[in-house]
């Protein structure tokens, strides 16, 4: 068996659609207000995909930027992983279209449907595949068009979510000398499928006139349960990193952009200042699997990824699933 290799992130990318949907726009659509949304979520606007865009469209933009950042030709990619719950279609995998349109000839591809935790889970899969020597160049995308599964008559969900994509290129660390993967976790609490879900369209509730009439094709969420769960596991994940590495090693925490109030409550529970956290939820809302890679790229652009310091990425969401990835930049 080959020796385990160190793995790094060679390139980062992000893309968000041009159309902006503000809280003021939503005031005209549902019974809500800018004040109500901001107080409860910290969100002021979100992006909405154009009618002629699909999830792979967004991912391809982000993937291309990540490849350019990594100085890697598309044909050198060996594997494409797409984290999404809003793929172009139920099957085949959206990763197949991403790889094809990017020009990743002969690359493998598959999707990971872990919702808000998807990108973090995908980073661990990619890192371990590169570490094992099975692959040298892996592209991981997190992409969502959540606006297509939102009920714009339900103010409890439609104000929270937006569309977007992010991407990262993984390769042996000796070739990129940055973003070294140090480890992470993947966990779940099963039996809570109904807390946050799109009930219709699968084998439990196949698509039918009846399922559409019952609005099962739209996202459903139990907000209070999600809030409590997210605060608890966010705090648990960051505390585990502190126990292993020490708080002084942390340069930035880039969490899943779930809700500003959840992030603030978790940081208060941990006892760390919000200055350590990179947040952009005010601009994009919750973009599920896209939120961490979008924020990671923007943190890079803002100079928040400090050389030699830890980048901690906790994520949590539907399933109920959670996990984290730790990098040393």
Predicted regions and their residues:
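Condensing-enzyme catalytic core mediating Claisen C-C bond formation in acyl metabolism
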Residues: 1-51, 154-228, 232, 236, ...
């Amino acid at each position: 068996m080959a020796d385990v290799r160190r793995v790094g992130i060679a390139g980062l990318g992000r893309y968000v659609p041009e159309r902006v949907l503000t809280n003021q726009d939503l005031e005209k659509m549902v019974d809500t207000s800018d004040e109500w949304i901001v107080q409860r979520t910290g969100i002021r606007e979100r992006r909405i995909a154009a009618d002629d865009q699909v999830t792979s469209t967004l991912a391809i933009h982000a993937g291309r930027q990540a490849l350019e950042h990594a100085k890697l030709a598309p044909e050198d990619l060996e594997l494409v992983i797409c984290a999404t719950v809003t793929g172009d279609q139920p099957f085949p995998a959206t990763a197949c279209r991403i790889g094809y349109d990017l020009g990743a000839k002969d690359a493998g591809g598959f999707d990971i449907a872990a919702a808000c935790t998807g990108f973090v889970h995908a980073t661990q899969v990619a890192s371990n595949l590169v570490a094992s020597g099975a692959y040298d160049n892996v592209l991981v995308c997190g992409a969502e068009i959540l606006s297509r599964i939102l009920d714009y008559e339900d103010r409890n969900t439609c104000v929270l979510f937006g569309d977007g994509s992010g991407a990262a290129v993984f390769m042996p660390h000796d070739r990129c000398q940055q973003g070294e993967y140090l480890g992470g976790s993947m966990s779940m609490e099963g039996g809570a499928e109904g807390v946050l879900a799109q009930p219709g369209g699968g084998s439990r509730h196949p698509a039918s006139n009846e399922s559409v009439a019952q609005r099962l094709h739209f996202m459903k969420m139990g907000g209070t349960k999600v809030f409590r769960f997210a605060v608890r596991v966010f705090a648990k994940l960051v505390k585990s990193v502190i126990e292993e590495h020490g708080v002084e090693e942390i340069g930035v925490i880039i969490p899943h952009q779930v809700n500003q109030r959840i992030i603030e409550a978790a940081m208060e529970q941990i006892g760390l200042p919000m200055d350590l956290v990179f947040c952009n939820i005010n601009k994009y809302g919750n973009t599920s699997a896209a939120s961490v890679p979008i924020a990671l790229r923007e943190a890079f652009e803002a100079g928040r990824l400090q050389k030699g310091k830890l980048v901690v990425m906790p994520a949590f969401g539907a399933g109920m699933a959670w996990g984290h990835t730790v990098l040393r930049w």
